[in-house]
């Protein structure tokens, strides 16, 4: 029987160690990557529970808005005309595929990733590529304006009454999210809606996993002074407080 020489044994041991080291590094990286979604969800849960504006109470009289959700995305629904703001010049019915929808008295405004908005009309259109860009961000963002009439409270549409001062602050935040042209007009993507009642507008700001559509909604509510989580990347981060 041939006995391996000490030199051969040392070489084999050295080769095995050389293989194990990068393998350990790869396994450590894989473990770290696997932990990222869990840490994200944990942070989302904790920071949604910690309230901004903890002393806020809903106004008895004022402007009635709604926060709407489809389970993933949220919108803020505002009356088109009030003593404090007329939204019709910013989101006119003339921008819609069917301008008759512009006769409604409310408009739902939401913020989102450009690629995801334009290429994911329904969840059946969701692709890995669209989801990836929605998470990491692809630069441009859009405002989605969906015209409605006489919205009613429901599980997916929660009313909030704001004082006039609170509503003015909300309006200021939302208006600042619209990108405008040299004449101060909003910039619609004509013909690029999901149906006859909605249309997209160019928006200001980035979109990524840390500043999502729901983060925007939460920031808008915090700007108004409403009690909201300090970070609200998920729809449930917002809606659970409004039950």
Task: State where each predicted segment sits.
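Charged/polar interaction segments and conserved charged motifs
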Residues: 5, 9, 118, 122-127, ...
